[in-house]
């Protein structure tokens, strides 16, 4: 093989290794990331997952940063975050969730794909390295909005459902960020998988402040 062919083959092998790792590794439990869920993504059938799930709704109450996060210490706000930032009512919130799936236990999980290089070494994809990346790009706000959008859509489709602590615990499993450059086939750790589950207290506030 020529040098170019060797390089292409190496890239394909690395991609296949990553893909098998992403799909075949038991996912960390967002409620307790040190533990594993009893399934991998390749065990979720097509009927129980949705890709590129778009959402769009009007913020009838506006968006007031200080009111949303005041007194909340479970997330790290970026230094450039302006607590006085606000948008008046009528602002439209929209986005797209990479993957939403329902697990065998009936809970729903949000998955987001990230190709961030971090420090270009697999060791950089440990919990601390991924946390720094989450804080740096404020992906925290992203999964909070995704979670709120999902619950809003679920409540709209199920009028009898009400957001309570018990209902939240039974319905939502959490969010999992897959930093794919740090994942490989047969890995024995959770490197590359950032799993988290926001508190009911925070989600309840966002749900009532952001949804109609």
Where would I find each of the regions flagged by the language model?
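Structural signature of nuclease core domains in nucleic-acid processing machines
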Residues: 1-212
């Amino acid at each position: 093989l020529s040098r170019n062919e060797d390089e292409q083959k190496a890239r394909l092998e690395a991609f296949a290794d990553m893909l098998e790792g992403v799909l075949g590794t038991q996912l960390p439990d967002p409620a307790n990331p040190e533990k594993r869920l009893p399934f991998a993504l390749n065990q979720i059938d097509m009927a129980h997952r949705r890709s590129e799930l778009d959402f769009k709704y009007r913020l009838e109450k506006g968006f007031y940063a200080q009111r949303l996060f005041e007194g909340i210490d479970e997330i790290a706000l970026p230094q450039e975050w302006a607590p006085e930032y606000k948008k008046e009512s009528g602002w439209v919130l929209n986005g797209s969730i990479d993957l939403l799936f329902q697990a065998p236990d009936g809970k729903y999980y949000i998955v987001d794909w990230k190709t961030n290089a971090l420090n270009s070494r697999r060791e950089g994809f440990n919990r601390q390295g991924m946390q720094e990346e989450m804080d740096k790009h404020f992906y925290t706000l992203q999964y909070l909005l995704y979670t709120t959008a999902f619950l809003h859509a679920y409540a709209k489709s199920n009028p009898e459902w009400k957001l309570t602590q018990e209902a939240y615990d039974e319905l939502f499993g959490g969010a999992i960020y897959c930093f794919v450059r740090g994942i490989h086939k047969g890995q024995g750790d959770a490197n590359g998988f950032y799993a988290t589950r926001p508190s009911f207290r925070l989600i309840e506030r966002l749900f009532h402040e952001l949804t109609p």
